[in-house]
């Protein structure tokens, strides 16, 4: 049972993502309602990934972390650094809100979608992943779910890591966290990653011209943070990070024209915050700035040639979030202000434009006996399309101790991005995409097995589609998504099991055809065990068949790509109390498959790494 005393205690401790840590036996979550609460009190399905999980899985990318989670389906045009899309519960990749330390990821500004193939996994200390609508709390984009990547580190000392692997993979990382006096803590991280990659274009009948090359990826990252405690009530932080990435890829081209097959991405982010932690009241003010420059070009001509394209975006954010303990729960309220600016000459937005958004939200959670009630409402005032309101409500009933029924309903929306509004084929009269979602779930603890079964429906209207004849974007699409999600985790002796199954029927509501690149069924299984100090891990994933389009001829045709079963194997061994060595075999049985038509994925890959702490 969710004890009232537990709730009251959790609501009165430090809140918000910059300070969120696993300090409670009942893990605390910030992202669900923008105030800290026990995970057991969150009515929406939530998954938490820690830095220890990432190291155990030996993940070399954020996509490799997310693909293991319930409801997540990733389509990628090749290997490391290649363009990728994240589908949560069948929604578009633009319907996933990605936050970095609670702040919207800047790279989604022009394209409208967050491509996490470019974000360094070395910076990720924790991920809080919420499924379902969250626009009533966060505003635009939070239709399918929210992924909050938290970079705040709480690991004093220094760690050196080096890794090597297939396709000339190399990774070198140094991170340190030191106390500067009694009340100040400093963190520094530097990371270098390189791989020659492989030829991502699939062989035979895809319509792509032969480009027999290796499509590699290079990333350099630097991160720094200062945290200071002024008193028992007040604390603050300053943080900055940047990365410089280069990706080689294969693209369509015309003989005699430049071949645009190289991407160069520069990204930097800075933020500062001040936090008040009272006995019953918490308040936080955060201001942030981010700037990204995304070039696509032919390396023979350079990124400043007239044939090159540039997407340049600046994003400014101010967030004021507050929460107060009320009764056996919490009430939260806050204001978000955001400004996105494009620079003249941006590839898809040739002139300079800016878009402002101010959002005001109110959330509440109460524990009334065996019932948990949750509600939220938000109003956004956007400089392009005016005001838009969203709301959601959920109720949980613990009808037997340890067993709970949950019902929820919520509205959400996706604002048109700057490319759709002001690009060469843009339409400044676009309206937001709108969603209505229902979900019912049972969850419980049976004989040591923690489980949850959910059924949901999502109706999305005014979807923004490109009209081939009019050569403009219009609000003319509709989608209907129905799904079932089941999750479970349990221990059997030294073995830890994590299981999930997803059935997703995502369809165009007008043509009744499947939405592209989504698997209809997914099954995922993670097994971890310790034997004589060896930490073993095995991952199994079944990805069902999916549909895509073959654009090699006009009119294009729909193609079906078959399902696949994938196995990964990992092992780690602590040679000493300071030195740990790790090894991994990904795609153990060397399966050949595609998640984007015409682009092959990696075959069997090996990695070996070691880390030394002091």
UniProtKB/Swiss-Prot annotation:
Q: What is this entry's stated membrane topology?
A: Multi-pass membrane protein
Q: What is this protein called?
A: Vitamin B12 transporter BtuB
Q: Please explain the role this protein plays, according to its UniProt record.
A: Involved in the active translocation of vitamin B12 (cyanocobalamin) across the outer membrane to the periplasmic space. It derives its energy for transport by interacting with the trans-periplasmic membrane protein TonB.
What are the binding positions for Ca(2+) 1 in this chain?
A: 199, 211, 213, 215, 250
Q: Which GO terms describe its molecular function?
A: ABC-type vitamin B12 transporter activity; metal ion binding; porin activity
Q: Is Lipid metabolism included in the keywords of this UniProt record?
A: no
User: What transmembrane ranges does the database entry give?
Assistant: 158-165, 169-178, 184-195, 217-227, 232-248, 263-277, 279-296, 309-325, 328-337, 353-369, 371-381, 385-400, 403-417, 434-443, 449-458, 473-490, 494-509, 517-529, 535-550, 558-572, 585-596, 602-614
Tell me which SUPFAM superfamilies the record gives: Porins
Against NCBIfam families, the record matches this protein to: PRK10641.1, TonB-B12
Please tell me the species this chain comes from: Salmonella typhimurium (strain LT2 / SGSC1412 / ATCC 700720)
List the disulfide bonds in this chain.
none
Task: Indicate the principal place this protein occupies in or around the cell.
Answer: membrane
> Sorted alphabetically, which InterPro entries does this protein's record hold?
B12_transptr_BtuB, Plug_dom, Plug_dom_sf, TonB-dep_rcpt-like, TonB-dep_rcpt_b-brl, TonB_box_CS, TonB_rcpt_b-brl_sf, TonB_rcpt_CS
Q: Family, per the entry?
A: Belongs to the TonB-dependent receptor family. BtuB (TC 1.B.14.3.1) subfamily.
Which stretch carries the motif TonB box? Answer: 26-33
Single Gene Ontology BP annotation:
cobalamin transport
One Pfam family, please name it: TonB_dep_Rec_b-barrel
Motif TonB C-terminal box extends across 597-614
Ranges for domain TBDR beta-barrel: 155-614
Domain TBDR plug, by residue range, is 38-152
Residues annotated for cyanocob(III)alamin binding in this entry:
85, 92, 110-111, 251, 309, 517, 551
Q: Which keywords accompany this UniProt record?
A: Calcium, Cell outer membrane, Ion transport, Membrane, Metal-binding, Porin, Signal, TonB box, Transmembrane, Transmembrane beta strand, Transport
């Amino acid at each position: 049972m969710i004890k009232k005393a537990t709730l009251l205690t959790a609501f009165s401790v430090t809140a918000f993502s910059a300070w969120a840590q696993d300090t409670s036996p009942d893990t605390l979550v910030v992202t669900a309602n923008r105030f800290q609460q026990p995970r057991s009190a969150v009515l929406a399905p939530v998954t938490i990934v820690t830095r220890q999980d990432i190291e155990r899985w030996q993940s070399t990318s954020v996509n490799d972390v997310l693909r293991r989670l319930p409801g997540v389906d990733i389509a990628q045009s090749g290997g490391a650094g290649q363009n990728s899309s994240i589908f949560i519960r069948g929604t578009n990749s633009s319907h996933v809100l990605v936050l970095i330390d609670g702040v919207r990821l800047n790279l989604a500004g022009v394209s409208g979608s967050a491509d996490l193939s470019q974000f360094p996994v070395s910076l990720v200390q924790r991920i809080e992943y919420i499924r379902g609508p969250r626009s009533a709390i966060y505003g635009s984009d939070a239709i399918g779910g929210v992924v909050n990547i938290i970079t705040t580190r709480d690991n004093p000392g220094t760690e050196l890591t080096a890794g090597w692997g297939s396709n000339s993979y190399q990774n070198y990382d140094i991170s340190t966290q030191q106390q500067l006096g009694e009340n100040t803590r400093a963190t520094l991280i530097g990371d270098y990653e390189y791989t020659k990659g492989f030829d991502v274009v699939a062989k035979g009948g895809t319509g792509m011209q032969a480009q027999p090359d290796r499509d590699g990826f290079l990333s350099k990252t630097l991160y720094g943070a200062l945290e200071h405690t002024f008193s028992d009530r007040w604390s603050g932080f300053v943080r900055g990070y940047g990365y410089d990435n280069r990706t080689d890829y294969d693209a369509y081209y015309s003989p005699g024209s430049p071949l645009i097959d190289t991407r160069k991405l520069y990204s930097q982010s800075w933020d500062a915050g001040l936090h008040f932690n009272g006995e019953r009241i918490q308040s936080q003010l955060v201001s942030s700035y981010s700037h990204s420059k995304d070039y696509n070009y032919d390396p023979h001509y350079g990124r400043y040639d007239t044939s090159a394209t540039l997407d340049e975006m600046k994003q400014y954010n101010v967030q004021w979030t507050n929460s107060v303990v009320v009764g056996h729960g919490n009430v939260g309220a806050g204001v978000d202000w955001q400004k996105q600016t494009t620079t003249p000459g941006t590839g898809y937005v040739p002139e300079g434009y800016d878009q402002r958004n101010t959002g005001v939200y109110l959330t509440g959670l109460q524990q009334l006996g065996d019932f948990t009630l949750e509600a939220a409402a938000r109003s956004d005032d956007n400089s392009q399309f005016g005001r838009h309101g969203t709301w959601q409500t959920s109720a949980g009933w613990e009808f037997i101790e340890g067993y709970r029924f949950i019902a929820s309903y919520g509205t959400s929306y996706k604002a048109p991005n700057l490319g759709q509004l002001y690009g060469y084929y843009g339409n400044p009269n676009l309206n937001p995409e709108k969603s209505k979602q229902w979900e019912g779930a049972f969850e419980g603890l049976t004989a040591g097995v923690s489980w949850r079964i959910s059924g949901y429906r999502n109706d999305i209207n005014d979807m923004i589609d490109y009209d081939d004849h009019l050569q403009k974007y219009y609000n003319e699409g509709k989608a209907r998504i129905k799904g079932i999600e089941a999750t479970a985790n349990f221990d059997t002796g030294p073995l830890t099991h994590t299981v999930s199954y997803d059935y997703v029927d995502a369809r165009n509501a007008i043509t009744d055809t499947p939405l592209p690149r989504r698997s209809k069924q997914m099954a995922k299984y993670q097994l971890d065990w310790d034997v004589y100090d060896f930490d073993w891990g095995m991952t199994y994933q079944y990805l069902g068949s999916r549909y895509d389009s073959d654009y090699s001829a006009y009119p294009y045709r729909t193609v079906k790509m078959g399902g696949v079963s994938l196995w990964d194997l990992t092992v780690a061994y602590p040679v000493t109390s300071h030195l740990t060595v790790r090894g991994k075999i990904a795609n153990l049985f060397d399966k050949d498959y595609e998640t984007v038509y015409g682009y092959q994925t990696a075959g069997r890959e090996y990695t070996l790494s070691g880390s030394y702490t002091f």
